[in-house]
């Protein structure tokens, strides 16, 4: 089989139609999957030694949230280094990053795999991956035909990257024209609320306005602050962080503004405060609503006049600091209650941002779950960590009162539990590995630190013993019934139990 002119024209047309780059990329991937008759296709962007999925077809939705590092995925590293079409043999020992991620075929391994690196000049900017479940699925397509596909995709991706950078430079006039991508903090999410937030971040980052970031606990307000700073003209200067809720009143003023030697007992030398450290940069004040009224007055003066006084010093110091503040409180209500100064509130909230709670972000839950699964896979040295369809449905049906932080902890705990239930480094997370109850949500966060402080092998074995013992008790001490409950082969269960000291 070879590509006809009509097929190539169709691919080119798909790259010119659609609203926005994302739509065009999705049309490209869907068309390629149909034309090449493959089981899965993906367009990936290369950034900071990792591949970031931009569009997928035939793969689980959580793939869009995963970040595939070169170190963790040898096939993708091979594609990145190749410079040309890569065909992996059906019996390749290199694990495929999409094994277990093709819906309806979770238990099957990917057999046929082609990688097309995408270049802008000599620079790698991305890759196309084509996967099939039959070993000879792509044998009828020549390398020359695949290079034509790669050339079309490279042009489309490069144009999108150039437009993205030009738009950013138009917002910030005077920036040097340089088309070299710099990795920034990434906010994962494609829901309308998150897309709107990203747009607002892009707008306000280019200015020097103070920003008040509101949102529930665990939504990612610090990540928003980092994104604003990194996209701002101040990005080359420091971003200094201060948690106002953790400041004892006795040292709060010194932490903010510094002190001179002898200002108080224990002040044995001059010390710069956070404002001085952030000079020409950005100061992020987390939990701003916890500051006392006295400190609020002094903070207001800095915002008004741009000068500070160290504790114990009569001299003023000029500082040039952009302030980003975050709170999980309703500061308007705090103003009405007399707990927060109205003038400070108006100074801080020149451009307010609101981070949506996870329960309002729809499918973003699955993307974030994929991101955390990939993190766990790398940290624990596993070959793969995938979510079963039931697990995805379970995550989508939960309300997430603890937001993204709770999801992260829940995924980490589920990975440990899922690994304990089976042999090997292939981990499949099922709904039963989650204990998601609104009233019990804090318990997830409380349990994880204890696990993290233990030796990983010992913690895993302890979970395995606990689960096997419980399953035996619930199944009348029948090893066969226990194996069925744990979804294990009974012979493997006997071997595992013997290794764990549960059998003689």
UniProtKB/Swiss-Prot annotation:
GO molecular function, one term: ATP binding
Function: Required for the expression of anaerobic nitric oxide (NO) reductase, acts as a transcriptional activator for at least the norVW operon. Activation also requires sigma-54.
InterPro entries membership: AAA+_ATPase, GAF, GAF-like_dom_sf, Homeodomain-like_sf, NorR, P-loop_NTPase, Sigma_54_int, Sigma_54_int_dom_ATP-bd_1
Sigma-54 factor interaction domain: residues covered: 187-416
Pathway(s) this gene product operates in, as recorded in its UniProt entry: Nitrogen metabolism; nitric oxide reduction
Organism for this UniProt entry: Enterobacter sp. (strain 638)
DNA-binding region, residue range(s): 479-498
Pfam family, one: Sigma54_activat
Name of the protein in question: Anaerobic nitric oxide reductase transcription regulator NorR
Residues bearing the modification 4-aspartylphosphate: 57
NCBIfam families according to UniProt: PRK05022.1 (NF003451)
GO BP terms: phosphorelay signal transduction system
Disulphide bridges: none
Binding sites annotated in the UniProt record for ATP: 215-222, 278-287
Alphabetically ordered keywords of this record: ATP-binding, DNA-binding, Nucleotide-binding, Phosphoprotein, Transcription, Transcription regulation
Entries under PANTHER family matching the protein: ANAEROBIC NITRIC OXIDE REDUCTASE TRANSCRIPTION REGULATOR NORR (PTHR32071:SF35), TRANSCRIPTIONAL REGULATORY PROTEIN (PTHR32071)
């Amino acid at each position: 089989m070879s590509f006809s002119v009509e097929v190539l024209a169709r691919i080119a047309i798909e790259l010119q139609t659609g609203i926005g780059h994302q739509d065009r990329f999705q049309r490209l991937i869907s068309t390629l999957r149909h034309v090449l008759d493959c089981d899965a296709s993906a367009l990936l962007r290369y950034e900071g030694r990792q591949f970031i999925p931009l569009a997928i077809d035939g793969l689980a939705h959580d793939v869009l949230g995963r970040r595939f590092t070169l170190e963790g995925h040898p096939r993708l590293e091979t594609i990145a280094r190749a410079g040309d079409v890569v065909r992996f043999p059906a019996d390749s020992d290199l694990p495929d990053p999409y094994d277990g991620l093709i819906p309806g075929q979770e238990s099957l391994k990917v057999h046929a795999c082609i990688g097309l690196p995408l270049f802008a000049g000599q620079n790698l900017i991305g890759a196309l991956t084509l996967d099939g479940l039959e070993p000879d699925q792509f044998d009828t397509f020549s390398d020359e035909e695949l290079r034509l596909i790669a050339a079309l995709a490279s042009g489309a991706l490069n144009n999108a990257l150039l437009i993205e950078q030009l738009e950013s430079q138009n917002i910030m006039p005077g920036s040097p024209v340089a088309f070299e991508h710099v990795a920034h903090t990434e906010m994962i999410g494609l829901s309308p609320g998150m897309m709107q937030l990203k747009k607002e971040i892009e707008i306000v980052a280019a200015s020097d306005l103070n920003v008040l970031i509101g949102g529930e606990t665990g939504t990612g307000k610090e990540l928003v602050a980092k994104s604003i700073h990194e996209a701002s003209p101040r990005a080359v200067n420091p971003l200094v962080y201060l948690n106002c809720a953790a400041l004892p009143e006795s040292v709060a003023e010194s932490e903010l503004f510094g002190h001179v030697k002898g200002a108080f007992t224990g002040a044995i030398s001059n010390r710069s405060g956070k404002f001085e450290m952030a000079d020409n940069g950005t100061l992020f004040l987390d939990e701003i609503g916890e500051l006392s009224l006295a400190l609020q007055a002094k903070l207001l003066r800095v915002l008004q006049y741009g000068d500070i006084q160290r504790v114990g010093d009569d001299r003023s110091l000029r500082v040039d600091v952009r302030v980003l503040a975050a709170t999980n409180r309703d500061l308007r209500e705090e103003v009405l209650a007399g707990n927060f100064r109205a003038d400070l509130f108006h100074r801080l909230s020149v451009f307010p941002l609101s981070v949506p709670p996870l329960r309002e972000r729809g499918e973003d839950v699955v993307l974030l779950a994929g991101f955390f699964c990939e993190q766990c896979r790398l940290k624990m040295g596993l070959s793969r960590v995938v979510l079963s369809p039931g697990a995805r449905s379970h995550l989508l049906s939960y309300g997430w009162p603890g937001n993204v932080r709770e999801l992260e902890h829940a995924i980490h705990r589920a990975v440990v539990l899922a690994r304990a239930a089976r042999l090997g480094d292939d981990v499949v997370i099922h709904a039963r590995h989650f204990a998601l109850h609104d009233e019990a949500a804090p318990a997830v966060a409380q349990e994880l630190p204890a696990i993290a402080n233990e030796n990983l092998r010992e913690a895993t074995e302890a979970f395995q013993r606990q689960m096997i013992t419980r399953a035996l008790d619930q199944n009348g001490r029948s090893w066969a019934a226990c194996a069925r409950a744990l979804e294990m082969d009974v012979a493997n269960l006997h071997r595992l139990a013997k290794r764990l000291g549960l059998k003689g």
